[in-house]
Amino acid sequence: MIRTLIIATASAAALFSTPAVTQERSQGTASIPDLSGIWGNPYLYGIEPPLSGPGPVVNKARRRQAFDVDGRPLPAANAPFVSDARQLVGDYTNPILMPAAAEVVKKHAELSLAGVGYPSPRNQCWPQGVPFIFTNDAVQLLQQPDKITMLYDEDHEVRRVRMNQPHPAQVTPSWYGDSVGHYEGDTLVIDTVGFKIGPFSAVDQYGTPFTQALRVVERYRLIDHEAATKAWERGAKENARGGGGIGETWAPDPSYKGKALELQFTVEDKGVFTTAWSATKTYRRVSRDWPENVCAENPHKYGTEKDATVPIAGRPDF
């Protein structure tokens, strides 16, 4: 799999609060939404640009002709938006990027086009941080009155969100930042600042950097099946896996017509971006067993890039 490099650490202020799954809030009669469970999105990275307004850096190589196992091109009608899973060519012309950040993304794109792997938190087995961690296929939410715990499918990464509390006056930088949250009606809102700087840190898989000014605000809510289906169709065009498709582990149950989980997040960093930008990720409930994925065991390389010049860790660094 692949990761990226950049900078991180932050400080700011925020808000948040959490309740148990069916507990009623004292303010009003609205009940706490049940967001608990395992939620999956099988598309590679699964990030959907907004319908309007500033959006994230996207993969310029994502819309490539698909080929079958024998190397024959598939009809465009069958697979018009299939990526080459080995190429991560970030759109460095995106106007959200300041010149220095655009240059970083461009250099990563040139390496990828040349078939050269580059280090990232994912392929170097380092903490992914936020919002990079949203590129994981799945997340499990555990709701409690005073906190929310978020477990991600890759390498046992964990985030903890304190409910209804402010950020401390002095935030101690950490890999996942200081996260506080609250409910706004049917929506869980999480505000995160104070990110630690690491050698491979990045906002996304294209190497987009960040600074100590990084702030990420997440909004989670349940949406109906029809809205989720439309979102997944958009996600397929942006994020389809090379070869046609959907990962078996997190593929949705075709008979499931229940609620889906929508994540809308906003990213701001005055040291890197010209403006705040937003993106969405849409999850469906996962009924399969949660598989173990330990990066240091090197269970698989990114895509089919067996000759990548950047090796995946063969053993833990700790």
Task: List each model region and its residues.
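PEST-like low-complexity, intrinsically disordered acidic/proline/serine-rich tracts
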Residues: 2, 9, 21-318
